[in-house]
């Protein structure tokens, strides 16, 4: 049994690879204590929820194991973003019930308890997303707290992490105030609730002290941070800090490690972040989901943006910060998308020259308003548009990476094996973007920052050699 993440055709941009509990075995499994199995599905935001639950379980003395048969209880943290994710979650619950029999369900699908009970009436307990205390209450009921010395710490200061030790996700808020017609996140996770700025910065400091070299800032809507508190003043280390994304980014930028922003909704005040990137305070990397370029489709999605104005914005951003890398996601085959709408999207894509792009064929989500829109698109047309879109972007990406050849770039090493090292530049987020291959460099270590001369490129990845002093 592994801690894993399901990667559905969702409109969020950031996905995590499968992570096994074994990777954290020394932190998670000292002897003694009732044994808990754990499966985590979904996006990085769900992964952070899993880390928080696991941290509390370890704090209370529970042992985390990677086998159904060795577990006293199994927790499944579910995804419910689209129908295929729902099915994956239901299948995983069924597998856990078959292999173990004692299952607690949490996460996004947990908000739809009746649907779970209809398929799997034998689950012990169900909670919605970020209901950490309720999860622990269910665990206490079916696997009582182990006895352990409360003065003996069973977890590191930064808590249990399911990512490699050199990078970590930093969730700054929960929920979303938008009502995009393809999305049901607000119905599962509620409206925006921002974490206190001092709490976020304290966590970031603990992660840095634990050896984290890269913070991946995530939420449902990162650029809306602090809207719910009307951007009131918070405090960090005794000093006042305004609770908005610009001020938070400035404070994170003082830590001297990579800070990467994800899920940045295209508000006008995104303009305020670009100078911070130009000054080197945060990485010049903007993950901003435009979703489409046709005004008709954007209106049907209840998304902001006019094609020409967005192009002007992108041009201005690049003038301020020439090193800026823009990642975005798009949906093709949205209900009502005409041939003209799609051609407009392709022309916009050619003009925008984005660096990293994800494209998803529209997939219906139970409860989403888009399901009621007339003129649903056939799967055949969706696939044809998806392939054409990706071919256009592939050519753009290849041309952009060719320009990297001959330059020296800072690379963070992700893994090393007998063939060499693999890393990423500032232009690449873990799991979703490209890689840099260093063939033969077997003496490097994960988390090292090294200078690399770029010597070769394809459509998505780079190859280079280590620059030695």
From Swiss-Prot:
Swiss-Prot/TrEMBL GO biological process terms: tRNA modification
Gene label: rimO
Subcellular location: Cytoplasm
Cofactor(s) needed by this chain: [4Fe-4S] cluster
Manner of cofactor binding, per the entry note: Binds 2 [4Fe-4S] clusters. One cluster is coordinated with 3 cysteines and an exchangeable S-adenosyl-L-methionine.
InterPro entries: Elp3/MiaA/NifB-like_rSAM, Methylthiotransferase, Methylthiotransferase_CS, Methylthiotransferase_N, Methylthiotransferase_N_sf, NA-bd_OB-fold, Ribosomal_uS12_MeSTrfase_RimO, rSAM
Task performed by this protein: Catalyzes the methylthiolation of an aspartic acid residue of ribosomal protein uS12.
Pfam families (alphabetical): Radical_SAM, TRAM_2, UPF0004
Residues annotated as domain MTTase N-terminal: 34-144
Keyword Iron: yes
Radical SAM core domain boundaries: 162-399
Cellular-component GO terms for this entry: cytosol
Binding locations of [4Fe-4S] cluster 2: 176, 180, 183
Methyltransferase found in the keyword field: no
Principal location listed in the UniProt entry: cytoplasm
Domain annotation TRAM: ranges: 402-468
Name of protein: Ribosomal protein uS12 methylthiotransferase RimO
Family: Belongs to the methylthiotransferase family. RimO subfamily.
Alphabetic keyword roster: 4Fe-4S, Cytoplasm, Iron, Iron-sulfur, Metal-binding, S-adenosyl-L-methionine, Transferase
